[in-house]
């Protein structure tokens, strides 16, 4: 059988598609997968490196654009639709999965025109425009968070969770004995080794870091009590741009921290953490719930439709995280939140347990099972 995975643009859209592709290929050595994306999306770089086939089509957004940009975007979508039909004729897929992002729209619509079974997956609590449109022509809508169900046709929406790649799942779910800690001794301001501490704090803002977190965290830790500062062990992924600034900030306050531009072994960093402070992207949420870790989310305020905040709020109402908006992390807001959680290990444990209850480690398997079963298209409205 053949599967097309269409969409991307960001890792949050693309990586679940890769997880589904892995599961689909594992079912039969003869199965084939083709990714379809746009030249400007992360897929243009990531998919070839992973060894998958990739076709690029014309696609662009039109929301929030001026009149000329909207016309150009519409023209690109029409051209992308024509390109998609050619790809479908050439590749002859049995199934098409849209994972969100601009490139998913023309491909899934073309699949509908050619009566090829088509499915979509929504990662966030607040769906993007493409998936809202495509839900009207999809055979099935797979969602990661139940909060997004109200945006889709009830009779063909299934809560599956957010698929994680097998490599990531294996890393996340290994026990400490299977994969002993590899994080080296702490660095004081990134330079001097020191002994282990009693409370592990892990901060990251994605592969590029998050400037607001990078500025706020050293200041927040500096406001903790001397006792709390002696207990805390900090692992802080900054991204390249802020590395030296963050190292200097910890040093200036006499604070111990392991400051790195990037962390390759995220699974170990996750597992060792008592508290994680990070953004609220869909993939991050899937990973931390898979591990049952307590998180303090600081949603990226400029995400489309503020969807990261909606993601965090979905967990917050279930007692599965703490959340501060970016405006609250300056001053004493962040330090008070850290101090409160440091002093209440039972609260941390409960947050982690509630997060673990939301984890769906079989998301990729369920999605592939559903696609292979085949269902009738949703009723168009």
Swiss-Prot record:
HAMAP family: MurG. GO terms for biological process: carbohydrate metabolic process; cell division; cell wall organization; lipid glycosylation; peptidoglycan biosynthetic process; regulation of cell shape. Its EC number is 2.4.1.227. It catalyses: di-trans,octa-cis-undecaprenyl diphospho-N-acetyl-alpha-D-muramoyl-L-alanyl-D-glutamyl-meso-2,6-diaminopimeloyl-D-alanyl-D-alanine + UDP-N-acetyl-alpha-D-glucosamine = di-trans,octa-cis-undecaprenyl diphospho-[N-acetyl-alpha-D-glucosaminyl-(1->4)]-N-acetyl-alpha-D-muramoyl-L-alanyl-D-glutamyl-meso-2,6-diaminopimeloyl-D-alanyl-D-alanine + UDP + H(+). GO terms for cellular component: plasma membrane. Belongs to the glycosyltransferase 28 family. MurG subfamily. InterPro entries: GlcNAc_MurG (IPR006009), Glyco_trans_28_C (IPR007235), GlycoTrans_28_N (IPR004276). It is found in: Cell inner membrane. Disulfide bonds: none annotated. NCBIfam families: murG. The keyword Cell wall biogenesis/degradation applies. Pathway: Cell wall biogenesis; peptidoglycan biosynthesis. Signal peptide: none annotated. GO terms for molecular function: UDP-N-acetyl-D-glucosamine:N-acetylmuramoyl-L-alanyl-D-glutamyl-meso-2,6-diaminopimelyl-D-alanyl-D-alanine-diphosphoundecaprenol 4-beta-N-acetylglucosaminlytransferase activity; undecaprenyldiphospho-muramoylpentapeptide beta-N-acetylglucosaminyltransferase activity. This is UDP-N-acetylglucosamine--N-acetylmuramyl-(pentapeptide) pyrophosphoryl-undecaprenol N-acetylglucosamine transferase. It is a peripheral membrane protein. UDP-N-acetyl-alpha-D-glucosamine binds at residues 10-12, 124, 165, 207, 263, 308. Cell wall formation. Catalyzes the transfer of a GlcNAc subunit on undecaprenyl-pyrophosphoryl-MurNAc-pentapeptide (lipid intermediate I) to form undecaprenyl-pyrophosphoryl-MurNAc-(pentapeptide)GlcNAc (lipid intermediate II). The keyword Transferase applies. Keywords: Cell cycle, Cell division, Cell inner membrane, Cell membrane, Cell shape, Cell wall biogenesis/degradation, Glycosyltransferase, Membrane, Peptidoglycan synthesis, Transferase. The gene is murG. It comes from the Bacteria.
């Amino acid at each position: 059988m053949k599967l097309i995975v269409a969409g991307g643009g960001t890792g949050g859209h693309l990586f679940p598609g890769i997880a589904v592709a892995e599961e689909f290929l594992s079912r039969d050595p003869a199965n084939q997968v083709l990714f379809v994306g746009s030249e400007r999306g992360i897929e243009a770089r990531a998919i070839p490196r992973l060894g998958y086939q990739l076709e690029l089509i014309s696609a662009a957004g039109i929301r929030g654009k001026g009149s000329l940009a909207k016309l150009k975007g519409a023209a690109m979508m029409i051209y992308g639709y024509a390109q998609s039909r050619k790809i479908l004729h050439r590749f002859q897929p049995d199934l098409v999965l849209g994972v969100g992002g601009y490139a998913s729209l023309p491909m899934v619509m073309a699949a509908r025109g050619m009566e090829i079974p088509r499915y979509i997956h929504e990662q966030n609590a607040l769906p993007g425009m493409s998936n809202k449109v495509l839900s009207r022509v999809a055979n099935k809508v797979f969602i990661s968070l139940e909060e997004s169900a109200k945006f889709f046709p009830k009779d063909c929406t299934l809560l599956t969770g957010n698929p994680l790649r097998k490599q990531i799942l294996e890393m996340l779910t290994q026990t400490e004995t299977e994969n002993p800690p590899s994080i080296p001794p702490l660095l004081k301001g990134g330079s001097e080794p020191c002994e282990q501490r009693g409370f592990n704090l892990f901060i990251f803002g994605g592969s590029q870091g998050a400037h607001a977190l990078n500025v706020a965290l050293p200041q927040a830790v500096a406001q903790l009590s001397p006792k709390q500062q002696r207990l805390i062990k900090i692992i802080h992924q900054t991204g390249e741009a802020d590395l030296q600034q963050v190292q200097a900030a910890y040093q200036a306050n006499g604070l111990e921290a392991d400051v790195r531009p990037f962390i390759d072994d995220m699974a170990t960093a996750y597992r060792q953490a008592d508290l994680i402070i990070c953004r609220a992207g869909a993939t991050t949420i899937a990973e931390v719930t898979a591990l049952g870790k307590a998180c303090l989310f600081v949603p990226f305020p400029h995400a489309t439709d503020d969807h990261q905040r909606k993601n965090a709020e979905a967990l917050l109402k279930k007692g599965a995280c703490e959340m501060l908006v970016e405006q609250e992390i300056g001053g004493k807001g962040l330090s008070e939140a850290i101090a409160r959680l440091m002093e209440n290990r039972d609260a941390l444990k409960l947050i982690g347990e509630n997060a673990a209850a939301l984890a769906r480690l079989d998301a990729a398997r369920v999605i592939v099972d559903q696609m292979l079963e085949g269902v009738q298209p949703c009723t168009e409205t």
